[in-house]
Amino acid sequence: MTPLLEIKNLVKKYKDVVAVDNISFAIHQGTCFGLLGPNGAGKTTTIEVIEDVVRPTSGEIFYRGQPRRDSFSDEVGIQFQSTALLSMLTVRETLETFQSLYRKTAAIDDLVQMCQLAEFQNQYNDKISGGQQQRFLLALALINQPELLFLDEPSTGLDPQARRNLWHLVQQIKKEGKTIILTTHYMEEAQYLCDEIAIMDYGKIIAHGSPAELIGIHSPEMTVILPQKQFVLDPDQLSMPVRTVKDTIEVKTNDVNACLNTLMSHGVNLSDLTIRSPNLETVFLNLTGRQLRD
């Protein structure tokens, strides 16, 4: 099956800095593809090159099996991290203005309903909240009925309720068969929304797969957590890594059943036990490090 979008040997250099270092990947129709990485990893440059905002140094970009054409910008939707809009226009007037720029467009009333804009559609652009603005920018990205949608950190700065609401909208868009490229610093968001993920660092793709595949390969261990007062064993009696964290004991294991059987056989009280499963954030930190980057 021909991918909707295919990137081959993409390179972008700025003088002596290689921002994107010979990366390749393909995205199939109807998937949500997450491009993740720490600050400076090259993901924003990659997205900007694919969007045709920045010219690549070398490499090829194919859309529907053909080299990307000038019409590409008319066929995709982009929600940037931030967009400057005219403050003298209302939300609905702005939607109408953007609609006039395209031949193929969605009905404004449909977008207003889907993105829950009705309550503030007659307010000025600079008079709406952060959560309302993100839903509004999503509606603008959908105005030309794109098959491919770029969402660049769409939930940054949103409170948990507004973020979950945005996730629901993205899920609705996926159900319509649209293809999404998502960048985000929220690993929970990527794990919840993405079918496939590429993790970038220093301009290269260092891991690629579904969230479950990445967790299984790069962070398979689970953590069994017990109150320290209930752990009456010498850690040397166990053949598993054990560490003390504040007033708890953490046991790392690839086989939870075997771990629990071992603890019970040594008379450990499991009544206040908790089990922490690995997640995408664990994978991300294991691969890219825990040191803060500017």
Task: Report each predicted region and the residues it spans.
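Conserved ABC ATPase "signature" region
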Residues: 96, 100, 105-120
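Conserved ABC ATPase signature
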Residues: 124-128
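Catalytic Walker B motif of ABC-type/P-loop ATPase nucleotide-binding domains
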Residues: 149-153
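Conserved ABC transporter NBD signature motif
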Residues: 59-72
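Short, charged/small-residue-rich alpha-helical element at the C-terminal edge
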Residues: 221-294
